[in-house]
Amino acid sequence: MLLNTKQMRLRRAKATRIKIGNSRQFRLSVHKSNNHIYAQILDPSSNRVIVSASTVEAEVKKQYPSGGTIEAAKYVGHLVAKKSIESQIYEVAFDRSGFKYHGRIKALADAARSAGMKF
């Protein structure tokens, strides 16, 4: 069975979400495109967005006009961690949405950890 790249990513995402879904923790969900990166913290019971940050926000776009860089991902990670700590969310489960833990995804996760989040 041959799968293309998107189908393989969605398959990995499904497996990860099954593992995370069993825990009753807040979920830090990350999505990336070629030009932007998005991070959201979701409530475990209702799947509602509590906190979000992305490279399309005006604050981030001022500093990083090109949102597809590792530096922009680090800034988004720091920003989402800062917002979550203000909302008194300190511990989350990391949902990388099937993306490999490398590059911008890793940079965002490391920046969020260094800003005080635990996962």
UniProtKB/Swiss-Prot annotation:
Keywords assigned by UniProt, alphabetized: Ribonucleoprotein, Ribosomal protein, RNA-binding, rRNA-binding
SUPFAM superfamilies in the cross-refs: Translational machinery components
GO MF, any single term: 5S rRNA binding
Origin: domain of life: Bacteria
One record GO biological process: translation
Cited NCBIfam families: L18_bact
Subunit structure, as described in the record: Part of the 50S ribosomal subunit; part of the 5S rRNA/L5/L18/L25 subcomplex. Contacts the 5S and 23S rRNAs.
PANTHER family linked to this entry: 39S RIBOSOMAL PROTEIN L18, MITOCHONDRIAL, LARGE RIBOSOMAL SUBUNIT PROTEIN UL18M
Similarity remark: Belongs to the universal ribosomal protein uL18 family.
Function summary: This is one of the proteins that bind and probably mediate the attachment of the 5S RNA into the large ribosomal subunit, where it forms part of the central protuberance.
Name of the molecule in the record: Large ribosomal subunit protein uL18
